[in-house]
Every structure is written in structure tokens, then in C-alpha cells.
């Protein structure tokens, strides 16, 4: 019996229209997801196109075909990373890194200690004003100052200020992580904190002996803004790597271009003749050898991981090196200004003003060239203004605890963050401790202290670019390169502890007993920092689950800056207890060595697999929640239509039965 192929009446095929024009209730979940996935990127005009964008060469056409053109969410920017976008990323490192080298690691602690000392008295009688630290005699006692009713050593004033600033910074970073991951806020927040931080640094020009507490407040504001902006900058790095043309090409299998091959240009009889002349057996290849060579298999997961890690490390190293070059140039200018102004407090304030101006001016290219790269928007909860901002902050803190729970499932993330917690604290504490040691114990003048940072920055440039060459030469993995840097880093506190050996102390040299000894140690510190800054950031970026960059980099920043609350505080307590800085080298020696075992056990390939699985589970969970929400809304809408049409509710109808 033949099947009935007659068309059914239209009334039997069409679904009854719902009243009140509720078009969305009649759409399937698939249709809605298709609408979301096919939304175009209309968030901003494309002002980042280079002059080569219009080039219609075959190479560009092939690259265009490999673009990930299907957006993941409304406003998703899936364009390949452009050269101008990379320059914008480097530009902000060029602008802001000067604050770290010339400001927080050099002249800010010097200025804070100087201002505190000008307001301090000797602990021996608590009446005699303290002299300048660069001319202090060995027989002088401790210099103390009262801050909010607390008696602290003037050398500890800067350490405690740094601790407060990084605590505030950690709290702020958590609060903004949600806005960075969701919506078109990543770039906006980056620029906002850049302007706030740079203007705060310029405001040091107004700080005097009478309002030195305001100088500490500016330190908190500027350091907090810098840290928040760099968290946002770091969250761009995985996106720049993911959409880099080299990575896109590695992820897509290459197929033969038959239109440009010899199949198209050869006469038909020659092609057939060649095929007929070739004996065909069970083991014959499907393609002719010369045609099969045109096929390129898709890169393996390990090869893609290696490619992304190499690219991430290179971009990160260039960013660090670019920032170091800028800081080196500006530091030399600042030293010249200090010498011309006779190493006065006014000279220190002027150079900090110059640092703020530099930060402001060179943020402009980053603002012009860096693409926003929006994340998926949050669900509209109907809140506006301040309430919407509070909702974002609350969601960010909830996300932090959720991110911590997710990170606990990633072994390599846990190992890295634990090691980075200690290592970043050691980096920050060693820098500030060394500057204060040189100023208060070795009595070095401000221009000489500035030379310490010139040497460390110069060495940092070679370290940023040289460690990649070293790792290739010795075939070192990223975590192995970090371990080598840690081993060199350990030499700094150990050298300071040599001053406790009686025979070294009798020599009067070595063990940080002479000012010139600070310079070779500064070179070691710079080389180490140049490697750690680039490799740690890129290694962590490869372990982050895709789609959670800002949230996990917020956790990275909390681990980084949050740990720096402890180091300076402990060193400050040691100074208050002993009256000298040298005992702090015992603490630094332990702090530098602890991260090594944790870094040793990191496996990047395993970490990327676990991160990808976690990202997939998060996506599946979100899709399932959306499906359930859409199904529920559609059922409620259909039920409402039915009730309006029949004049009674389902419950009433059941009750009537």
C-alpha cells in the first residue's frame, strides 16, 4: 500500500497563533540560540583597520576564510589579532611600566621615608629631630614618627603604606573582574584606572613635609589604579593569542585548492592518461603523491599548545621589554633632574610628576589601537545607575568564590597560584627592602638610588628578551625557565646574609657593606625579574579556562598583590623590632626559595586539558540553564494565552472536574 503523500490541510500543519502578539513564545530554543550566536559585532566602529586591510591578495583571502566568524555572544569580536592591536597592548606597557620602575620601586619609597624622617624624632629621647638618612651617623638611634597615634620606624612607613595599597588593590580587582569579563567594559575600565593613577602620580608635586600623610594616600591611589589596570591589560593577553592569525591557522586543517592546482590547468586527456597509466592496487594512495603533498593535517593538541605558549611568551616578553626600555629612558632623565636640583625633596616631587605625565601621554596610543574585545553581557536585571554597579560588584564577589571553587579543580592552576603567591611577594618585598636598605644603612643619595634602578632596568630588558633565547638554547620548558630564575633570585638575600659572617664583616666589604655592591645585585635582580614577569604571566595564561580570562586574572592579581600585603608588613615589623633592615634578609631567603617545589610540578599540557574541560562544563551548564529558562517562559506564555482565550485557569478547570 502506497503511503499517503497528499498534502494535509494547512490548518492541521500550522500551529495556532498566540494572542497579544507574543512572537518569542512561539520560537524554539534552537531559534533563540541561533539568534544569539549570529549577532553581529556592532559594539563599536572598526577604527583599528590598518592600511593593509583592503589588500585582496590570495594570502589575505585565505586568512579571511580561516577567521572564527561565528560569534559566541552578542558583540563578540572574533576578528584576528591585528598588528595595530598588538602595538596598542605594548603601548600601555610602555606607558605604565615607568610607574613601577621609576615610581613605586625607586622614588616613591625614598620620598615617603624622607618626608616621614623630616617629621620624626630619635627614639632615644623622642625629642631630638632626626637628621637626613643619607648623612646619618652609625651612632644615631632609630628615627620614629607617629602616624594616627601609632609609633613606627620611619623606614617602615613606606613598607606599611605599600601593604595598605596592595590590600585596597586586591579588593578593587575583585570588584571590577565581573565588569571586565562581561559586556564592553574591559577597555573602558583599563583607561579609567590609567587616568586616575597617572593624575595621582602627578599630584606628588603638591606634597610637602606638612601633608606627608597625603603622600601616602596618593601612593595607595596610584598603586591601586596601576594594579587594576594591569589586571585588565593581562586579561587581553589570552585573547590576543587565541585570535592571532598563526594560532587560527594552526587550528584549521588546510584543504587542497583544486582551483589553483594542476587538475584545473591540465588537459582532460592528459589527466585521464596519467590515471590510466598508473596501476591501481589495494595499497595505492587515493591521491597522486604530488597532489597529496598539498594537504596539511590539523596540528595536534600538543602542537597547538606549544604554539600558543610560544606566542604568549613572546608577546608577554616584548611587552615587558618595551616597558623596561621606557622606564630606563625616563629613569635616566629623572636622575639628571635630581642632580640638577641638588637631590632635594622638591627634585623627587618633580621627577614623580614627570612619571605621571609619561603615564598619561603614552596611554593615548593604547586608547586608540587596543580593541575592546567585549565579553558576554550579564542578564538584564532591570537595575540602573548605582544599583546596577552594586549588582556588578556583588556578582563579582560571588564569581570570585565560584572561580576559587573552579580553580580548586585545576591542579596546575593551584600549584601555580600557590607558587606565585610566594614569588610575587618576594619580588615586591625585595625591591622596596633593598632601596630602603641602601638609603638608611648605606646612606646612598637619591641619584645613586636612581642608578640602582637604571642598572636593574637595563638588565631587565636583556632578561625579557634573553630568557627566550636561553630557553630555546637549552630546550627548557616555561616552568623550568622560571625555576632557573628563582635560583638566581636566591643569590640576592643570601649575599645580604654574608654580612653576618665575622670574617666578611672584618673585611668591610662584601655582604652589602659598601654602596657599590648594590649595583651588581641590581643587575641580577633585573635579569631575574625580566624572565619571571614574562614567563609567569604567559604560563598562567595558558592554564586559564577559555572564556574566563578576566576572572582568573583577577585571581592572579589577588594572589600577586594580596600576598604583597604580608611581605612588607613582616619586614616593617622586623625593622620596628630590631631597628635595622639586615635581619629581613633571613625572611627574604626563605620567601624566595619556597615557590620552587610548587613550580616544578606544573604540567602545561595537563593544565590546558583540564581548563578546556572546565570551560566546556561551564558552557554546558549555562546552556542548560538558558534552555530551562526559555522552556519555562514559553510554557508560561502558552498557558497565559490559553487562560485568556477560555476565560479560566487550568487550576479552575481541574477543580470544576
From Swiss-Prot:
The keyword Lyase does not apply. Residues 113-155, 209-212, 339-349, 406-409, 468-481, 537-554, 605-657 are vacuolar. Residues 26-40 have a biased composition (Polar residues). Belongs to the ATG22 family. Disruption phenotype: Significantly decreases the radial growth of colonies under nutrient-rich conditions. It is found in: Vacuole membrane. Residues 1-91, 177-187, 234-317, 371-384, 431-446, 503-515, 576-583 are cytoplasmic. The gene is ATG22. Vacuolar effluxer which mediate the efflux of leucine and other amino acids resulting from autophagic degradation. The release of autophagic amino acids allows the maintenance of protein synthesis and viability during nitrogen starvation. Autophagy is required for proper vegetative growth, asexual/sexual reproduction, and full virulence. Autophagy is particularly involved in the biosynthesis of deoxynivalenol (DON), an important virulence determinant. Pfam families: ATG22. CDD domains: MFS_Atg22_like. It comes from Gibberella zeae (strain ATCC MYA-4620 / CBS 123657 / FGSC 9075 / NRRL 31084 / PH-1) (Wheat head blight fungus). Glycans are attached at residue 343. It comes from the Eukaryota. This is Autophagy-related protein 22.
